[in-house]
From Swiss-Prot:
The keyword ATP-binding applies. Mg(2+) binds at E256. Its EC number is 6.1.1.20. The lineage of its organism: Bacteria, Bacillati, Mycoplasmatota, Mollicutes, Acholeplasmatales. Its main location: cytoplasm. The gene is pheS. This is Phenylalanine--tRNA ligase alpha subunit. It catalyses: tRNA(Phe) + L-phenylalanine + ATP = L-phenylalanyl-tRNA(Phe) + AMP + diphosphate + H(+). It comes from Phytoplasma australiense. Keywords: Aminoacyl-tRNA synthetase, ATP-binding, Cytoplasm, Ligase, Magnesium, Metal-binding, Nucleotide-binding, Protein biosynthesis. Pfam families: Phe_tRNA-synt_N, tRNA-synt_2d. Tetramer of two alpha and two beta subunits.
Amino acid sequence: MHNKINLLKEKFEHDLAKNKNSLENLIYLEQKFLGKKSFLQELNQTLKNIPSEKKPAIGKLINEFKKTIILSLQKEKQYLKTQKMNLELMQESVDVNLPGFNFSTGSIHPLYQIIEQLEDLFLSLGYEIKDGNEIESDFYNFEMLNIGKNHPARAMQDSFYINPQKLLRTHTSNIQVKEMLANEGKPLKIISSGKVFRKDNDDATHSHQFMQLEGLVIDQKINFLNLKETILTIIKELFGDSQEINIRPSYFPFTEPSIEVDLVIRKKDNSKEYLEILGAGLVHPQVLLNANYNPEKYQGFAFGIGIERIAMIKYQIENIRHFYQNDIRFLKQFSKKVKHENS
């Protein structure tokens, strides 16, 4: 029996050396030596006829032979697979002389570029940036801002109500009210920005959703001159030193007095066109009282800027819809324009 096993070992080594260059031949060898009708199976059958006292030793030799066959075949198969993979990699190697691919580089949306420009300005002036909810209660969106349940000014901001108590905010002033309450009657200097929603008819210059940035300053001895200087700083940042403006009286329930600011655009015939740019005013005493400020001691001013309107005027964009359609041609064109101006 020992001689038979040794002869099979020699035969396997001979056949392996002859057939190891082909994966198909290795599979054939596997069947020949390990399959159901293989040499190894014949050895297992003859084991039945071996005397009992010799079976353990012979069985051990057979198992060692089987293990040798399995490991040898696995080694040669892996070698062939590695060779094949290396050959494929060489054939598929990258030609470094070929031109590369151009990948599109993203950029910040035009509206957020305007917001970031203004945020940088106000941070340099000592303001803090605050954020708040887009879904707001009627109480914080209207009543705390001196716009009662039956106040006619509510018609100016026809709104999207979720239920009788909740609505999509019509301005970012809800953030200001909450910050005033949290500040417990101390000086305050903040800006806030984000989406606001009004039931408007969408057209080239109006949208039911738009971006707004508002500012609020509360301290002792705040007056209209402080507000005017802030407005001039904003205009200078956005449109340069030479931009002419027009300040005219207006009405907002939460400020008194209230103003609106127009850009003065001179046409070729030297006539003037007035483009509304922002609303502002001194904080109404009732709003101060609502937020636990003493109007005899503290005063404040507030302003609100429509970001889309700024961008449309600044970059001569005729249709507000361009900001929301995600047309890559428009966004790329605008991105180049901004980079050119900042360079």
